[in-house]
Amino acid sequence: MIELDGIDHVALAVRDVRRAADWYIDVLGFEPRHEGMWDGVPVFIGKGTTALALFPTHDPKPIPRPHGSITMLHLAFRTDRAGFAEAQRDLRKRGIDFHFQDHEISHSIYFRDPDGHELEITTYEF
């Protein structure tokens, strides 16, 4: 069996790497990790053990994702009860629309980044 320690990073295609990095840094508190390598692509940002690799897309139009297509559905971040409440307050303050979902075992909020990637913040403490 292959022994894994966890997911190292998730690679996201974005229309503007700098804008996307700034958004994740400002909204979710990520920090710059690795920049300037490989001609600046990708830009790595992260928070704790979570990291994103931001790659520029060559097509500025959003990619249509028909229901049922094989693709990443959303990217979920875990927090505690206090962090979950703070995330909702902060998103409201920033004018970022989100919706709440009670999953019975967890509570989640869903919203989108500037490139349309669906993000989830979830807690198992409620």
Regions found by a protein language model. Name each.
Residues 1-3, 6-15, 43-46, 63-126, ...:
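Vicinal oxygen chelate
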Residues 2, 13-52, 56:
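Core segments of cupin and vicinal oxygen chelate
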Residues 30, 59, 96-97:
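Short beta-turn/strand-loop junction motif enriched in small, turn-promoting residues
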Residues 34-36, 63-68, 100-102:
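Short histidine-centered beta-strand/loop micro-motifs
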Residues 50, 59, 124-126:
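Residue-level signature for short turns and capping positions that connect secondary-structure elements
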Residues 55, 59-64:
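A short, acidic/glycine-rich surface segment
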